[in-house]
A protein has these predicted regions:
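CE4/NodB-like, metal-dependent polysaccharide N-deacetylase domain
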Residues: 67-88, 108-112, 134
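Acidic-and-aromatic substrate-binding clefts and catalytic sites of carbohydrate-active enzymes
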Residues: 4-8, 28-36, 60-65, 93-97, ...
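A short, structured active-site edge motif that brings together acidic residues
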Residues: 48-62, 82-91, 146-147
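Beta/alpha (TIM)-barrel catalytic core signal, keyed to glycine-rich beta->alpha loops juxtaposed to Asp/Glu
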Residues: 91-258
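A structural motif
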Residues: 22, 80-83, 115, 140
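N-terminal binding-site loop/beta-alpha segment at the start of enzyme catalytic domains
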Residues: 1-51, 81, 105, 238, ...
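Short, well-ordered amphipathic alpha-helices
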Residues: 37-42, 71-75, 106, 128-132
C-alpha cells in the first residue's frame, strides 16, 4: 500500500518492497504518487508479468468525460500499458453521476484493455448488490474496505464471501494502533512475532487480503514473513473479540455504512 506516501518516500518505499519480495503494489489517483510508483517499477527491472498493480479512480473523475481519460493518465504516470486491477475508489456521493454510469465506464476500461480486473472500494452491501446487477456477477474482483482488529467490517466481509468477491483490507494495522494493543502484543510474544505479523496471519485465516504499508525495509520483510505465524483457535477468537467498530476513515462523502 502507498497511501500517504509522497515523492521520494513513495518511490523508495515501493523500491524496498519490490526488493524484499512484494509483487502487489496498490496506489490511487488521489494518492498523488502514481508517477513515483511507476519510477520504482521501472527501475526494479522486474518483468511486468511478475507484478500485480492496482490503482483507483477518484470520485471526481467518475463522469463520462473524465473516467477513461483519467485512467489513461494513470497509466502514463505508472509507465504501464495496463493495470491488473482498477477500482472505483469511493461510490459517487451525489446524484449527478449514477452508479450505472460509472460502473459502465469501469467495465469499458476493462473492454479497452486498460485493466485486467475491475473492482470497487468502500462499497456497502447495498451498493455491492446494485453493482452486481449493473456489471454482472463474477465481474467484481474485490471490494477494498477498512478492516483491522478494531473494525472488522464483518457484515460486508461476509457479503463479499457469499458473492465470491475478495475482501481486501486497507489500514490493516489501524495506523499503528495494533502495535500497542496488549492482546496482540501478548499473542505476538507467544510466536516470537510482531503484532503486524499476527494481524496478517489472522486476516489470512479469515480469508481477507491485506495491503500493508511501511517505509522500513525491515518491517516490509517482516510483513512478508507472516506465513510462519500459526495462530491457535483461541488466539483467533481473542482477535475476533477486539472488534469495537472503531472506524478510522470516514470522510463526509462516505456512504451510509453497514
Amino acid at each position: 500500500g502507498t497511501f500517504r506516501l509522497k515523492g521520494d518516500e513513495a518511490r523508495e518505499s515501493v523500491s524496498k518492497a519490490l526488493e524484499v519480495g512484494f509483487r502487489h503494489i496498490d496506489t490511487a489517483q488521489f494518492y498523488g504518487n502514481e508517477a513515483q510508483v511507476g519510477d520504482a517499477i521501472k527501475t526494479s527491472g522486474l518483468d511486468r508479468s511478475e507484478l500485480f498493480v492496482t490503482t483507483k479512480v477518484w470520485y471526481e473523475s467518475l463522469g463520462d468525460d473524465h473516467f477513461i481519460p483519467s485512467v489513461h493518465e494513470s497509466l502514463e504516470k505508472l509507465k504501464l500499458e495496463y493495470v491488473d486491477l482498477l477500482l472505483i475508489h469511493w461510490p459517487y456521493p451525489g446524484n449527478d453521476i449514477s452508479l450505472e454510469s460509472y460502473l459502465g465506464n469501469l467495465a469499458k476500461a476493462k473492454e479497452l484493455g486498460l485493466t485486467r480486473h475491475i473492482g470497487v472500494s468502500n462499497f456497502t452491501i447495498d451498493l455491492l448488490d446494485k453493482a452486481e446487477k449493473v456489471i454482472g456477477k463474477g465481474e467484481i474482483y474485490t471490494n477494498q474496505i477498512e478492516i483491522h482488529p478494531f473494525m472488522q467490517n464483518k457484515k460486508v466481509v461476509e457479503a463479499c464471501k457469499e458473492k465470491g468477491i475478495k475482501a481486501t483490507a486497507y489500514m490493516p494495522f489501524a495506523v499503528g494502533k495494533v502495535m500497542k494493543d496488549e492482546t496482540l502484543l501478548r499473542i505476538a510474544q507467544n510466536h516470537d512475532a510482531t503484532p503486524a505479523q499476527v494481524v496478517l496471519a489472522w486476516m489470512e485465516k479469515r480469508h481477507i487480503y491485506a495491503i500493508p504499508s511501511s517505509t522500513s525495509k525491515v518491517h516490509l520483510a517482516e510483513n512478508l514473513a507472516y506465513g510462519g505465524v500459526h495462530l491457535t483457535d483461541s488466539e483467533l477468537a481473542l482477535i475476533d473479540d477486539l472488534d469495537n467498530g472503531d472506524r478510522i476513515v470516514n470522510p463526509d462523502f462516505a456512504p451510509d455504512w453497514d
